[in-house]
Amino acid sequence: MIQTRFSASRISELLAGGTGKTAQSYILDLAMQSIGLREEFSTPAMTHGIQNQLNGFEQVVKPLFPNAEWHDEFILINEHCGASPDILNESSPMDIKCPYYIDTFIEQINKPPSKYFAQVQMQMMACKSEIGRLVFYLTKPEEWGQETEVVEYPFPLELRFKIFEFTKDNEIQEKILEKVEESQPKKIQMIELLNTANVISEEQFFYEQMNGFVYRKLQECNNILNLASVIRVNDKFYYKK
């Protein structure tokens, strides 16, 4: 079994309120990864963000924080969770975001999303730091098929970034640890459920539904832990309604 841990980048999903399906979806993703199944998902905005983080580090962070170093490696908080800050400035973490659209950049620098605040708080826990920083950097995305260098936005660099400094928030950090401890046993239960799934062929899956059975994707279940068993077809999991 592959070792998986709850990470800062998705910790807001564990903290989400409502029905609990957001948290359940994250726990299920980790359980799937634990048995070697991982669905890769990417969008142009995600690709843009990843490709331009180093650019933002060199253009924005390094001139202002000469001691800063690119890090992007996992740091354990405990055996169940950890964080991967993009940058370490001495012992304090920094995370860099590169919004894809101008309006997204403006919106986020006016009010940083709470999910990023939680992410930085968890990075601070990993680094045992009292301070963490969040960097927003706007750079023009490359268009599909464009072979030449991207022509940058005609705005001065000082208007294309903003850095937020956060101090340690004991309440949110304690809540993060509580949610991780609460979710770890659920992950173990889901791993067991997946490992003991009833494996059926595509043919059986097809004909059973033609004859009246109803299967739904496991992700759609309101409470996976209430299921007695699940069905596996290739690398996909379902439950019977």
What do these predicted ranges mean?
Residues 1-241:
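Accessory terminal regions of nucleic-acid processing enzymes
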